[in-house]
Amino acid sequence: MSRYRGPRLRITRRLGDLPGLTRKAAKRSHPPGQHGQARRKRSEYAIRLEEKQKLRFNYGISERQLVRYVKKARAQDGSTGTNLLKLLENRLDNVCFRLGFGPTVPGARQLVNHGHVTVNGRVLDIASYQCKAGDVVAIRERKGSKKLAEANLEFPGLANVPPHIELDKAKMSAKIISKCEREWVALEINELLVVEYYSRKV
């Protein structure tokens, strides 16, 4: 399953606020579609599926990528759900979004893919790169790159800079000073339901 490229507000009406997907808030509170306002009891499977979809759409990843992250999270010590969120938060495109370099995760990914971002002084165009403590993430020293980031920093998206990252706005550079903690995740999500969703699938 590839990344979603359709109307973003349609997704937020169904799943709630997704800071990584869009800056805009849905005007209608009920889900899209002809029967969107109908009230019906959701099954446990539907609830788990919804939480899984929140992760996919917020971080802009495909189903195949998410399955890989779930497997990685399971292989690590500690809570699988917390490990999963940390893996997604540490992606380079998400870090750039949290810093305000991009208005959304897809916008930040575009900056990375087009060579506007450096890690430890070298241009890195791999959006899935796992940022770690000690890494310095910055906007490339190039007029076009700086201009793009300046516009985004002036009107930042819905995420904020988490405590484990120190941002120097003037230099458009940030240093990751520690590991990401669960409470610093901007998305409202029940990661345990995501783990349960994949418990029999992966």
From Swiss-Prot:
GO CC aspect terms: small ribosomal subunit
Entries under Pfam families matching the protein: Ribosomal_S4, S4
Region ranges (Disordered): 1-43
Keywords for the protein's UniProt record, in alphabetical order: Ribonucleoprotein, Ribosomal protein, RNA-binding, rRNA-binding
SMART domains registered for this protein in UniProt: Ribosomal_S4, S4
Keyword Ubl conjugation applies: no
Swiss-Prot/TrEMBL GO biological process terms: ribosomal small subunit biogenesis; translation
S4 RNA-binding domain: residues covered: 90-152
Any one GO molecular function term: rRNA binding
InterPro entries referenced in this protein's UniProt entry, alphabetically: Ribosomal_uS4 (IPR022801), Ribosomal_uS4_bac-type (IPR005709), Ribosomal_uS4_CS (IPR018079), Ribosomal_uS4_N (IPR001912), S4_RNA-bd (IPR002942), S4_RNA-bd_sf (IPR036986)
Biased composition (Basic residues): 1-13
PROSITE patterns (alphabetical): RIBOSOMAL_S4, S4
Function: One of the primary rRNA binding proteins, it binds directly to 16S rRNA where it nucleates assembly of the body of the 30S subunit. With S5 and S12 plays an important role in translational accuracy.
Assembly and oligomerization: Part of the 30S ribosomal subunit. Contacts protein S5. The interaction surface between S4 and S5 is involved in control of translational fidelity.
Family indicated by similarity: Belongs to the universal ribosomal protein uS4 family.
Protein's name in the database: Small ribosomal subunit protein uS4
Taxonomic lineage from the root: Bacteria, Bacillati, Cyanobacteriota, Cyanophyceae, Synechococcales
